[in-house]
Regions:
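Acidic/glycine-enriched connector segments
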Residues: 1-156
Length: 156
């Protein structure tokens, strides 16, 4: 399954003027992997790029019904502090996902890293939106590279 699985990592803050372009590039990258035989797409369920990636997978699922959206969530309380609108979007994605996995029960200091490592450890490709050489996305991209996972940075 790992050889047919792609994960995503990207920044939470996405410039509003770039969302459509980022969505289109993400969709294009996913479709390229589908054509190579990828079926499983793991998304971390965060705001920003994760949300864009989830919607891109769901849109492509209309044309490629065999693909699967797998939400890999860091904890049950991930949405604490989110706006009602963001929670509703999250719940919509969660409802449409083919599978939901939690890597921790409760929020802890390291639960986001644990979720990111789980995504990478179960994938052979990673589509990223990395524009800064710092933070969780930077860590996850470097972790993926160290594990021999193919990284496709749509920000390049």
């Amino acid at each position: 399954m790992k050889e047919k699985t792609c994960c995503f990592t990207g920044h939470r803050e996405i410039p509003s003027g770039q969302r459509r372009r980022i969505f289109a590039k993400t969709e294009e990258a996913i479709e390229g992997l589908i054509k190579k035989g990828y079926l499983y797409f793991g998304v971390g369920g965060a705001l920003g790029f994760d949300t864009i990636a989830a919607f891109a997978v769901l849109k492509l699922k209309e044309r490629y019904p065999d693909i699967r959206l797998i939400l890999v969530l860091p904890c049950f309380s991930q949405t604490r502090g989110w706006s009602q609108e963001d929670i509703e979007i999250y719940d919509d994605i969660k409802q449409k996902a083919d599978k939901v996995v939690y890597t921790s029960q409760e929020y802890t200091r390291g639960c986001m890293h644990k979720r990111n490592r789980h995504l990478v450890d179960n994938s052979s490709a990673c589509i990223s939106y990395l524009t800064e050489n710092k933070g969780g996305t930077f860590y996850t991209v470097n972790y993926a590279k160290s594990k021999g996972v193919e990284v496709i940075n749509i920000a390049e």
